[in-house]
A protein has these predicted regions:
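Cytosolic juxtamembrane helix and N-cap/initiation of the first transmembrane helix
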Residues: 1-17
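Membrane-interface helix-boundary motifs at transmembrane edges
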Residues: 1-3, 56-67, 90-91, 122
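Generic alpha-helical transmembrane segments of integral inner-membrane proteins
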Residues: 15, 80, 102-106
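Alpha-helical transmembrane segments of multi-pass membrane proteins
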Residues: 15-27
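The feature represents the first ordered module of a protein
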Residues: 25-85
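Lipid-handling modules and contact-site tethers
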Residues: 26-28, 55, 90-93, 101
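Membrane-helix boundary connector in multi-pass membrane proteins
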Residues: 83-97
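Alpha-helical membrane-associated segments of multi-pass integral membrane proteins
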Residues: 93-129
Length: 129
């Protein structure tokens, strides 16, 4: 499990979100359109749970890809909400808020790339038999 590169990218994603949740003030990352800190907490906790489940699904590559796609969807929704907030309010601190989904998306895209690479390798081995 841990020796696979996609698991390492998912662990980076997990620890990045965990560090943000534990050490940073959630009010800073809250979106002012909704003015609720609970939404950002739900976002981060759900992404943490989905990442943890994805790490545990290391033998089921399609389920791992599906859970990563759900997480990509959540990050894109958060990214769009922050972008709308920036254009509506003209806030200058949007860049730090955008770091959460951008960094997480990078980790997830790399993890998906290596999951697909493993799947292609398994398919090619099955073809050889």
């Amino acid at each position: 499990m841990i020796q696979r590169i996609q698991t390492i990218f998912l662990l980076f994603n997990f620890f990045y979100l965990l560090i943000i949740y534990i050490f940073f003030d959630i009010k800073f990352f809250a979106v002012t359109i909704f003015d609720h800190e609970i939404l950002i907490e739900i976002y981060i906790i759900s992404c943490l749970i989905i990442t943890f489940i994805s790490i545990l699904l290391f033998k089921k590559r399609f389920a791992q890809l599906f859970s990563n796609k759900i997480q990509i969807f959540l990050h894109i929704i958060y990214f769009l909400i922050i972008s709308i907030e920036f254009f509506v309010s003209g806030s200058l601190n949007f860049f730090t808020k955008l770091l959460i989904p951008i960094i997480c998306l990078i980790f997830i895209f790399f993890a998906n790339k290596f999951i697909k690479k493993d799947e292609d390798l398994i398919k090619s081995i099955d073809r050889i038999r």
